[in-house]
Amino acid sequence: MEKKHADRLRSKFPESLEGKKLICLQIPDNYQYMEPELVELLLAKLGSYMEIPDNEISFMQRVLEPEVMDSLSEAIEYDSMDFIEVNSAFARSAAALGPVFGNVLDAGTGTARIPIALCQLRPEWKLTCIDLSANMLKVGAENVEKAGVRSQISLELIDAKAMPYPDSYFDIVISNSIIHHLPDPLLFLQEVRRVLKPNGAIFLRDLLRPETREIRDNLVKLYAGDCNSHQKQLFSDSLQAAFTLDEVETMVETAGLERLRIYESSDRHWTAERAWCETL
């Protein structure tokens, strides 16, 4: 683990870790000189603090959930969940960062609720909204039609980790809750850097992985208490698949994205943002 994680563990659990040696590892950017088995092992441990039994320390390790919600029933159920307040707050913040006229990318658009809200705030924007789930986009197309914003929104079935767009194409890149779905978000972040104009704006937001299962369960009760059991499980799984703020900062730095402000924006979210500027 990184030294800062080890130091944090020692400060939070001095008695549990007294006399124990914490090994700090840094995975190199270039894997070609490492044994494939070692690379696989190290990558599998990304997002976890250490291998210690739960009865000794209770930091929650990252557990992946499926990258794509692929069935129509899942897309419909996801769209029915109450994200109005969260989506509206996201749209307001994103709108404040971009230019008056903008070519916008929404990566992992899901059912297009956020771009619809953005169209109402920024009628001059043109939004390219991509997702890897055809059924999410199918529901999204219905939402776009009902909202009457087809002239502003283009929905495309595209992998955000390998986008077909030219370099320096977009004025602003936004994404809500895509990163916790990705096994390796670095590929996506590198693509963001490539397709964004050098002076472009960025607004990324996702869930924070809680430090313990107890905190995770309390968040589920607080924010999904009125949901059905399947929706509660979806939220719980998403929290456990998320990253810590330290991990996000490391990934953003490794991807070469500069001048971003990265911060904990709620008790369950992190945000990475950068305002558009007329010139660098």
Model-based region annotation:
Residues L105, R113-A162:
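Class I SAM-dependent methyltransferase SAM/SAH-binding core
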Residues M1-I57:
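Short polar/charged helix/loop
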Residues M163-I172:
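A short acidic, Gly/Pro-enriched loop at the edge of an enzyme's catalytic core
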Residues L207-A255, R261-E264, H269-T271:
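C-terminal alpha-helical "lid/dimerization" subdomain adjacent to the S-adenosyl-L-methionine
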Residues G200-D206:
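Conserved beta-strand signature within the Rossmann-like core of class I S-adenosyl-L-methionine
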Residues I84-G102:
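Conserved alpha-helix/loop element of class I SAM-dependent methyltransferases that forms part
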